[in-house]
Amino acid sequence: SGSNAKFLSVMDLDVRDGRVADYQYRLLPIFANLLPPDPQMTSLIETVREPFKQQLETELATTETTLYRRGNFMGSFDQVIVDALIEVRGADIAFSPGFRWGTSLLPGDPITVERLMDQTGITYPKSTLNEMTGEMIKLVLEDIADNLFNPDPYYQMGGDMVRVGGLRYAIDPGAPIGERLSDLELNGKPLDPGRTYKVAG
């Protein structure tokens, strides 16, 4: 359970007369550094990694601040990703899927290919560049926000808010759909509903 399987979920059931009379649930922390690694599994992992080890350990950069993907809206590694999408794709705005995973890096840590891959390892790895009007951008963001914040749990799709680069906005999660986002700005100017923007994702 939890991020990177840091816990075991433990549920104790009190069963009486064929029915659950009571239950208790708790998270049991796993202190991986105190558990001896399984030799067979260690060997298997090393064998599988060996052909890719040099590439995975290639250092791309060194962190200046803590890099993470943990927030519901944005993390510092998310910012690196959307900034890169804007720069590489020549976009005005970038969207990146909202996730809370990957290894957090502390200031001074190397950013290796492996660390980058565990931040971006998803099933739809291609990046795109599309043209979207300001109106469409707001509609997309409103739709995603509704998947998260709809008051009816049957309409909530889970996940996190899409990560956004280049665009600033305010959000009121309790507002109705179509009214959650406001003050959308690109480079300090209001997003123009009628203008077409280049959007990387």
Residue ranges and their predicted role:
Residues 22-27, 59-65, 115-123:
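Short acidic (Asp/Glu) and glycine-rich catalytic loops that position anionic groups and cofactors
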Residues 7, 79-201:
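Feature captures C-terminal
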Residues 1-55, 148-156, 160-163, 182:
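Active-site-adjacent helix-turn-beta-strand microarchitecture at beta-sheet edges
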Residues 29, 35-111:
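Hard-cation-handling environments
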Residues 2, 70, 74, 129:
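Glycine- and other small-residue-rich loops at beta-strand/loop junctions that grip anionic moieties
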